């Protein structure tokens, strides 16, 4: 998801905060006194699975909905709403049988048509998550159109025909884009987006539980019968405008869980919150994207400038001094926690600080068209990004001898809206937190032609072909080989500049127990208990 993520993006796993103003109050609200509070951000869009591809909305949908499979804490896919998911001989057609006892929070049953119609809503309306359905028969290369490959066999069974054999199809189905929708939302998606009705372990606490720019309150879903039943009285997502304020609330035990701490406490948070912290790698990576539509950044000139800028960033120094070792310099576009990761991909020397080579490449670009102006990196001020953006801009400035600086946006939503409208006047920070644990998920949604998370409008036909080939691979080894070949193309073109792999660096209050963080750096909220 595109950190998609306000912080992870320092994606997704990272951080939210607000002083004691809008959203600053963290008093418990819900059905009881055992409500867990955690940080969040105001969702960019209505809370529908097809419209949500950023962390603010994604966190909330994760507790409101359950999919055909779910992911264990280590990222292993296990059956959830599905009783069985079976492929044919070449994995081009799958039969999905549902448990017959699952219900939405409004009491209606979760049936085959709730999946089929929900997925078709996404593709027929060309919603943001349509790209995840491009593998199905009937959709175009961008996942739009009617999914003719879905057939209802009976109330609790349906089949899915894919364009090509897809051996990892089942493991993808835990992503929230593949969630079902109740009949009420299918009949009125606008209403469902403002007052989501899901089939997960939690539900909206009330019709006004979404207090925009303040918080979103959930309570346990009494109709839920799956394996992730809430061990608390609900979860309230508090929308912060700064990481520092979130950390202040956490330190005073006014907030229960913060999944990202501000740069100002990287050196001290583990001692200040002794025994109540997490600092571990997860499936995420941070970049900054340089849009194709910017002057000086297309064609051969653009390729030279992108490589020069990448080599002008001193990742080692920044990760040590700004992040105090809670980040690791990136060697590719994915994450080292994923199967098939390779730190030695051909061409990744472009991700190593090399000031002399950077100057040489910049001079070659100037010979094509002289540079003028200021190189900027856009970022959201509510995500704790200023320190590293300033350090990165200074590294570029000092190496290349050009003006470079950060370009702050008030909040994550404002930044995303500008990206969506193609209104960026410079580069912009972004990142990725795995939707499901696979290399493919880090590459196709962000860099395939027309993909919704491809906010820089990158397009390379050879890369697109390799994505199709990787998706159709019959073994993981074959898929990995193809995906690493695709990464060599990205390392030449640098549609985004990989910076570092983040740790989830967070903490929890003295008021909660059983706090764990999963494979993508998110707290496992249903397990958390209040003292």
Model regions: which residues?
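Structural transition elements
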Residues: 328-365, 383-387
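Ligand/substrate-recognition segments at binding pockets and active sites
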Residues: 363-434
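N-terminal lobe/hinge region of extracytoplasmic solute-binding protein
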Residues: 39-89, 197
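Gly/Pro-rich hinge or "lid" segments in bacterial periplasmic/extracellular proteins
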Residues: 166-229, 234
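Detector for C-terminal structural segments
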Residues: 31, 313-340, 384-394, 417-531
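Surface-exposed binding/hinge segments that line
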Residues: 97, 131-183
């Amino acid at each position: 998801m595109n950190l998609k993520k306000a912080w992870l993006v320092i994606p997704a796993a990272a951080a939210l905060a607000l002083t004691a103003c809008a959203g600053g109050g963290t008093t418990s609200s819900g059905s009881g006194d055992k409500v867990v509070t955690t940080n969040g951000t105001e969702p960019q869009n209505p809370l529908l699975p097809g419209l949500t591809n950023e962390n603010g909305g994604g966190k909330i949908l994760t507790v409101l909905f359950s999919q055909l499979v779910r992911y264990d804490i280590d990222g292993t896919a296990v059956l959830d709403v599905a009783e069985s998911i079976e492929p044919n001989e070449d994995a081009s057609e799958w039969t999905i049988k549902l448990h017959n006892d699952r219900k939405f929070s409004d009491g209606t049953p979760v049936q085959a048509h709730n999946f089929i119609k929900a997925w078709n809503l996404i593709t027929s309306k060309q919603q943001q998550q349509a790209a995840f359905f491009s593998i199905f028969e009937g959709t175009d290369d961008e996942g739009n159109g009617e999914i003719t490959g879905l057939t209802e066999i009976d109330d609790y069974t349906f089949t899915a025909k894919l364009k090509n054999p897809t051996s990892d199809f089942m493991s993808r189905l835990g992503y929230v884009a593949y969630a079902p929708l109740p009949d009420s939302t299918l009949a009125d998606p606008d209403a469902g987006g403002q007052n989501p009705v899901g089939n997960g372990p939690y539900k909206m606490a009330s019709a006004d539980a979404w207090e925009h720019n303040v918080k979103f309150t959930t309570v346990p879903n009494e109709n839920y019968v799956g394996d992730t039943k809430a061990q608390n009285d609900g979860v309230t997502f508090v929308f912060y405008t700064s990481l520092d304020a979130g950390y202040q609330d956490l330190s005073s035990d006014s907030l229960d869980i913060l999944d990202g701490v501000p740069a100002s406490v990287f050196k001290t948070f583990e001692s200040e919150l002794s025994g109540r912290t997490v600092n571990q790698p997860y499936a995420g990576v941070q970049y900054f994207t340089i849009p194709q539509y910017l002057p000086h950044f297309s064609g051969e000139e653009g390729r030279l400038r992108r490589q020069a800028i990448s080599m002008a960033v001193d990742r080692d120094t920044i990760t040590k001094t700004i992040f105090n070792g809670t980040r690791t310099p990136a060697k590719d576009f994915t994450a080292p926690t994923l199967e098939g990761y390779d730190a030695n991909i051909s061409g990744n020397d472009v991700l190593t600080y090399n000031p002399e080579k950077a100057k040489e490449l910049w001079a070659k670009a100037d010979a094509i068209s002289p540079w003028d102006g200021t190189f900027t990196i856009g970022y959201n001020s509510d995500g704790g990004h200023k320190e590293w953006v300033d350090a990165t801009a200074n590294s570029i400035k000092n190496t290349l001898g050009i003006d470079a600086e950060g370009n702050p946006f008030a909040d994550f939503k404002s930044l995303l809206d500008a990206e969506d409208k193609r209104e960026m006047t410079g580069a912009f920070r972004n990142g990725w937190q795995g939707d499901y644990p696979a290399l493919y998920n880090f590459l196709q949604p962000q860099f395939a032609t027309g993909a919704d998370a491809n906010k820089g409008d990158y397009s390379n036909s050879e890369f697109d072909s390799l994505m199709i080939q990787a998706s159709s691979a019959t073994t993981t080894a074959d898929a990995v080989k193809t995906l690493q070949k695709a990464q060599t193309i990205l390392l030449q073109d640098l549609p985004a500049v990989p910076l570092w792999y983040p740790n989830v660096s967070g903490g929890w209050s003295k008021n909660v127990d059983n706090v764990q963080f999963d494979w993508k750096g998110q707290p496992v909220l249903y397990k958390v208990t209040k003292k």
